Amino acid sequence: MWYTSTRGMAPRVNFEGALFSGYAPDGGLYMPEELPRLDEETLRHWSTLSYRSLVKELCALFIGLELIPRHDLNDLIDRAFSRFRHRNVVHLCKLKNGLNILELWHGVTYAFKDLSLSCTAQFLQYFLEKKKKHVTIVVGTSGDTGSAAIESVQGSKNVDIIVLLPKGHCSKIQELQMTTVLKENVHVFEVEGNSDELDEPIKAVFADVAFVQRHNVMSLNSINWSRVLVQMAHHFFAYFQCTPSLDTHPLPTVEVVVPTGAGGNLAAGCIAQKMGLPICLVVAVNRNDIIHRTVQKGDFSLCEVLRTTLASAMDIQVPYNMERIFWLLSGSDSQTTRALMEQFERTQSLQLPKDLHNKLSEAVTSESVTDEAITQTMARCWEENQYLLCPHSATAVNYHYQQTDSGQSSIRCCLASASAVKFPEAVQAAGLTPETPAEILALEHKETRCIPMRRGDDWTQMLRVTIEGLSQRWKDCVVNPSE
C-alpha cells in the first residue's frame, strides 16, 4: 500500500513514511493511492467481529505485511487497547426512542482520541525500536488530542512530545490532564491564543522540510494518516452494531452522526463510505460552522472570530482534514486540491467548484448547534434516560432529537466523542450534577508544569529551539549512554 500527498507534488511513501510525517513536503496530507473495495460478503463477515478484531482487519488492509507482519500487528493493537476501562473497548448504548450512542471514550483520558492514538503510538514504538531512532512529536490541541497523545507516549525513552494548548480555551480537567504529567519526555506549552492560532507555528515548522528531517519531527494530530485509519473502525462498528440485518440486498443504510472539529473522524467516515460501507454521514458542529457552511453552500471560508463554546474541543475554524475529503471526492485530483487549498491559505476564503460541492453534499449532511441547544439536549437526554452527555456528543444527539421530533425514523448512530466527566462546567450549565471519578478529582492536587507562549513572543522560534534542544539531548545520550 502506497500513500500519496493530496497536493501531488511529493514522493509517494509507504505506511511507515506516512506514519512518521506531519504534513507532506508539499504541504498536503497523505492518503492511500487506492482504496480497497469491500464486497457484501466481507462486510457480513466483519459484522461478526469485535471492535478490537475490526481494527486489526482494517489496519491489515493499509499496512504492508512486509512492514508489520500480521502477528506483530495483532499484538500491537492488543497492547494499545489493554488499558481501556471497557472490556469491549467501545460500547453501544441503546436508549429510548431509537437513540443509539456509540461510546468511544473508555480510554485513559476519557476521549475518543485514545483509540487512534494508543494504536499509533504502538506502531511508532515498533519502528523506533527496530531502527534505534528518536522522534520529536509536535501536537496542537483544542482539548482532547493533547492529553491522549501525552498518555500514549509518556515515559518513552526514544520519543519526546511537545504539546501546544490554548490558554483559557480548554476545560480545567482537559488542561490538568496535560500539565500534571511531569515525565521528562513531555513538554507542554500554554499558548495565549486559540487552537487555530497555535496551529500556525506548527505548520511553519513542518514547512521547513530540511529542519523536520534533520530533527525527526512528526505530528500526532489527525493530519497523521494512522489516526484516520484507526478511526475508520468507528464507522464500521457503528454500522454493524445498529443495522438490524445484513441478509438483505442491497444492505440497509445507517446514519452516522459525527461531532466534528478538525474533521479527522469525518474523513475516516468518507473513506469508509468510499470502500463500500452503506452509511449516510451527518456532521455536527458547534457555532464554529465552517464545515456546515461548506456542506450547505460550498463556502469554505473563515469567520472573523473564533467563537468560544461549551463544546470547546470543536472550537476550530480550520478543519484541515477537509483537504482529504476534497481530494477523495474530486476523484484523487491533486491539481484541483492543491489549487483550492493554496487559495484558502492565501485568502482564507474559498467557494467550492459546483461539481465538488454537489459531491460533498451527496456524501454528507450537516448541522450547526448553539450552546443553548447543547444544554437543552444534555438536559433532555438526562431526563429521558438518566444518561449524561458531554457537550460535544450532545451536538450529535441534538440532530437525532430534531429528526425524531419531526417524524424521521432512520436507523441512526450518534458517536460520543468524550465522557461528560471531562466537562463539569457544561454539565452544570445544563442544570445537571457532574459525576467526577476519583482519578479526575485527584488532578486538582497534583503538581503542574507548562511553559507560557505569550502574545508578542516568536512562537515558531520557541518551537524550533525546543526541538533543537531535544534533538541534541538525544544525540548526547547516544554518544554518552551512561550519562
UniProtKB/Swiss-Prot annotation:
Enzyme class, first EC level, given as a word: lyase
The protein's Enzyme Commission number: 4.2.3.-
UniProt KW keywords: Lyase, Pyridoxal phosphate
UniProt keyword Oxidoreductase, yes or no: no
N-terminal signal peptide: none
Keyword tRNA processing set for record: no
Pfam families for this protein: PALP (PF00291), Thr_synth_N (PF14821)
Family assignment from sequence similarity: Belongs to the threonine synthase family.
Record NCBIfam families: thrC
Modified residues (N6-(pyridoxal phosphate)lysine): K113
Organism of this sequence: Mus musculus (Mouse)
Cofactor(s) annotated in UniProt: pyridoxal 5'-phosphate
Function: Acts as a catabolic phospho-lyase on both gamma- and beta-phosphorylated substrates. Degrades O-phospho-threonine (PThr) to alpha-ketobutyrate, ammonia and phosphate. Also degrades O-phospho-homoserine (PHS), but this is not its physiological substrate.
Molecular-function annotations in GO: lyase activity; phosphatase activity; pyridoxal phosphate binding; serine binding
Protein name as annotated: Threonine synthase-like 2
